[in-house]
């Protein structure tokens, strides 16, 4: 990052940390509502793409039903934005309380001594899944596509790595898996 980008990054990081200290109900209701309003009504962020995808995915549904799904999508997207803001300030204890995994012991036992891949969709609160490190001794790699905006890319990288998850750019995945594939260091890719 150049000097100006470093200033932008620090402002973004500390702003998110400060906002993240607000009660979660305020964040999700007020800030989430504001983000939803901006994305859905003002900016109309990818609205035509969403409508086209819904029409292709649900041709049997009426226009009104698809619009309801569209509104719910933007509601969900705004919550993901709030989750991202929370990543700058949330405590390890709180993030481990927020995301609960079923059958972790069985998965860990089955994968004992092996590297493994967890394929996850962008459904639910995917930004908070970085807390899987709370449940494993494995080296957790989170594969991501770098953002074009270097300030936001650095923000996401720092936020995702706060609890020990190692963000890995998509193009560097194989190199990092090989590097982490030493005895006793089995990577888990999420």
Feature annotation, model-predicted:
Residues 1-117, 124-125:
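Membrane-proximal helical "anchor" segments flanking the first transmembrane region
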Residues 88-190:
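Soluble catalytic domains of membrane acyltransferases
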């Amino acid at each position: 990052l150049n000097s100006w980008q470093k200033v932008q990054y620090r402002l973004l990081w500390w702003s998110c940390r400060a906002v993240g200290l607000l009660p979660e109900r305020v964040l999700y209701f007020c800030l989430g509502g504001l983000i939803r309003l901006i994305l859905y009504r003002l900016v109309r962020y990818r609205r035509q793409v969403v409508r086209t995808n819904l029409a292709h995915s649900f041709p049997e549904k009426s226009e009104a039903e698809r619009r309801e799904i569209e509104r719910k999508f933007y509601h969900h997207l705004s919550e993901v934005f709030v989750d991202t803001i929370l990543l700058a300030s949330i405590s390890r204890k709180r993030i481990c309380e927020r995301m609960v995994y079923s059958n972790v012991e069985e998965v860990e036992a089955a994968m004992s001594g092996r590297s493994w891949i967890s394929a996850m969709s962008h459904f639910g609160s995917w930004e908070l899944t970085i807390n899987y490190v709370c449940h494993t001794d494995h080296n957790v790699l989170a594969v991501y596509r770098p953002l074009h905006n270097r300030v936001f890319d650095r923000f996401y990288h720092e936020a995702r790595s706060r609890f020990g998850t190692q963000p890995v750019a998509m193009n560097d995945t194989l190199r990092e898996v090989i590097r982490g594939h030493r005895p006793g260091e089995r990577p888990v890719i999420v």
